[in-house]
């Protein structure tokens, strides 16, 4: 991949792709002072939302809060462009509470473009990147390359479709569904990354020439329907119920514009019969493609086949913006031919006269299995080459944005010869996701879920700033104003918790009878407000209602103090588990350990541990292919060896923090 041409331009960091991962990566790198360029196929489709125009949801909102806590932008833009907000899982515990916002997709894209254009150190270029320029082995070490030997090459730049060369010390690939992208409507298909936009050529082949393995995945999006053709008055309305809730921790980003309602309809027997009669006409069920689609976002065909006992499925009608009649038919993606799609839509109550503005389609595309990456999202084969977003096999804007921030951060640190930042899975959903991606052989699009985290009570959305903003400050991503806001919030929360622990409600106080009636428990003499909060059904909002708390106190402060108090026992136990994991991570591994002789380890773990030879248990946990079960086996082996040896055996004692 050597060349005789001089670069057209030279940058520190080049980001390839202008989606949600690419934008976060480029902004992060530029804010850290690196001369950065963002290359995209279409500057008019920056941070586009080609599927659901929404941000957040279970686990996804936690990711958005975490990105914001680290200085990212997805939360700010979602707040600024939200047209409806709802709290999901409100009846359950705070570990699974989730904020979800419908956004104005065109306004979201416009605001992101403006943000990029006004970010210092950041240049925008509209071009198709088709090649990677490297220094080193052009085959990336070949098929027999051993990761323990280190990278086989170093990135030096990119080449575009029309032959221009751009130099770079680091490159972040965030190509989404555009690599080898092909969209399908029935058995008809065309090369495209998404409807109306060309696929990216050459980059898949460039990666394969460097020794990378690529595979195919599939996703899809439903039809868009003209709002004016729907009998909305016949359908159940779903209004906004959380206009005063925000993703960003920065009050300066809070915005509450005019809210819009969604509506709910359901599939009918006619819908199901149409699908059953025409399954063979889809690309998947017709055997034309076999790419794996997202398990947690199935097509309507998959729902009918997999849940044959259900006679109806809920469908949500969601507006795409304030200035467009387009309605997103959520839960109704399909790969059926266009004429049948219209029949399906008109089989839904309220949509009997529906006008279809855009047909549903499936898209299958090339992706880079993330086991070929380090936890920093840098590729193992090529130093300075990073990958983030849907290219890594994930699905969702939120997952992409989080990876983009991590890749942009570590690309900047690679150039500065600084240590990469690894996010442990016990500290954030970002860490949980990346740990899953780089260590598991995933065969379907990955979506973050609260069930994927062993520590979800600690990894809540409301405390993402407490968990990650100090790190963001240390890394240079949080400015002085944001840091002062964070410190002020912490002080206010601590003061409120102290007040709740000290102030008592006496049985003779005016509010006592109502409180006793609501909680169903008597007040014996007096009770601290903290103990009152610990009673089931009593919340900070109730204290305000009874005149026992300051209504002027910011909602995040009141609710944060409540959660800390109400769930203090559970939080303490989970924190002990996390601390134990951290202590175990500092355990030294003997240099002479024979992994092949530890029969309780999986075969893959024995091979990987022998090749990498980690110094600590924490480093072993970062090795792709070494599972949690393997780590437990290794820890048990260490304990057994310790009992068999002298108590003073220093090589088995806990040591300082592994880096």
From Swiss-Prot:
Pfam families attached to this UniProt entry: GIDA (PF01134), GIDA_C_1st (PF21680), SAM_GIDA_C (PF13932)
Protein name stated in the entry: tRNA uridine 5-carboxymethylaminomethyl modification enzyme MnmG
Naturally occurring in which organism (per UniProt): Synechococcus sp. (strain WH7803)
Role this protein plays: NAD-binding protein involved in the addition of a carboxymethylaminomethyl (cmnm) group at the wobble position (U34) of certain tRNAs, forming tRNA-cmnm(5)s(2)U34.
BP GO terms, sorted: tRNA methylation; tRNA wobble uridine modification
Annotated Gene Ontology cellular component terms: cytoplasm
Residues annotated for FAD binding in this entry: 17-22
Keywords: Cytoplasm, FAD, Flavoprotein, NAD, tRNA processing
Chain residues that bind NAD(+): 293-307
Gene: mnmG
Cofactors required: FAD
Family: Belongs to the MnmG family.
PROSITE patterns, A to Z: GIDA_1, GIDA_2
PANTHER family, per database record: GLUCOSE INHIBITED DIVISION PROTEIN A, PROTEIN MTO1 HOMOLOG, MITOCHONDRIAL
Gene Ontology molecular-function annotations: flavin adenine dinucleotide binding
HAMAP family in UniProt: MnmG_GidA (MF_00129)
Subunit structure as annotated in this protein's UniProt entry: Homodimer. Heterotetramer of two MnmE and two MnmG subunits.
Cell location: Cytoplasm
